[in-house]
Structures are given as structure tokens and as C-alpha cells.
């Protein structure tokens, strides 16, 4: 008599095999979701070292907004939500100015965007008094930069 752990499966008859192939479908395999990655089999080898991913540096104007706020109103703070809105506002204005200045450079068939194109873009993008103040502040900044 064979030990209990070693039972041999009974042989199937050829007639039963034909019925099972026609009647049964192979179970559908589940595909892993696109967002999740399966871990690699075998783990990490002894010779392999994992490379650390460096974080992408996201440039914001938050520190500069805060510095200007403290110059203008030293006693007033700003919430993180308001800071995010101000950062988005500055990014939007800079985007508009760069688009306009590049368009001006293309119209004049110039390969370089100079302070003149930026100044004209400021006059076109920003309204009235704001444009005048920005042009004067920009001119002051450029003269300070060139003199130093």
C-alpha cells in the first residue's frame, strides 16, 4: 500500500478530455494596474546598489514674494494658499511677457530678446500706470546691473 502523502492521480479517458477542452475556458489572467509596479523577483543582488532618485527642484517665487511683503508691510503675514496664488500669478505674467517679447523678436527678425523687447512687451501686456511703473523699475534695475 502506498503512503498517504503520495496518491497518484487517476488517468483520464480520451472521451473525457475532449469534453473538458470544449466546455471549459481558460481562466482569464488579471493584468496588473498601470499605476502599480510589481516587485522584481530575486530581490537586490549583493553587487547591485540602488540609485537614489534626486528630487526635481521646483522653482518658485515664494521667498521673493515674502521678502517684498516684509518690505512693504512688515507686520502682515500671508497664508500658504495666498502664496500659491501669488506664485501662479507671477508665473502667468512672466509667461505672457516672454511670449510677447519672443513674438516681437520674431517680427523684427532678431535672434535675441533684449531689454528693449521686454520693455515693449511690458507696455503691451500690462495696463496703463502699471506698465509705466514697471518700465521705470525695470530701467532702474538694468542700469544698476550694468553699472556693477
UniProtKB/Swiss-Prot annotation:
Alphabetized CDD domains for the sequence: HFD_H2B
Compartment(s) of residence: Nucleus; Chromosome
Record-listed N6-acetyllysine modification sites: 7, 36-37
Molecular function via GO: DNA binding; protein heterodimerization activity; structural constituent of chromatin
Positions of region (Disordered): 1-57
Predominant location category: nucleus
InterPro entries for the chain: Histone-fold, Histone_H2A/H2B/H3, Histone_H2B
Keyword annotations: Acetylation, Chromosome, DNA-binding, Isopeptide bond, Nucleosome core, Nucleus, Ubl conjugation
Pfam families given in the database record: Histone (PF00125)
Post-translational modification: Can be acetylated to form H2BK6ac, H2BK33ac and H2BK34ac. Monoubiquitinated to form H2BK143ub1; may give a specific tag for epigenetic transcriptional activation.
One cellular-component annotation, GO: nucleus
Cross-link (Glycyl lysine isopeptide (Lys-Gly) (interchain with G-Cter in ubiquitin)): 144
Record field: compositional bias (Basic and acidic residues): 1-32
Function: Core component of nucleosome. Nucleosomes wrap and compact DNA into chromatin, limiting DNA accessibility to the cellular machineries which require DNA as a template. Histones thereby play a central role in transcription regulation, DNA repair, DNA replication and chromosomal stability. DNA accessibility is regulated via a complex set of post-translational modifications of histones, also called histone code, and nucleosome remodeling.
Family the UniProt entry places it in: Belongs to the histone H2B family.
Assembly with partners or alone: The nucleosome is a histone octamer containing two molecules each of H2A, H2B, H3 and H4 assembled in one H3-H4 heterotetramer and two H2A-H2B heterodimers. The octamer wraps approximately 147 bp of DNA.
The name this protein goes by in its record: Probable histone H2B.2
Naturally occurring in which organism (per UniProt): Medicago truncatula
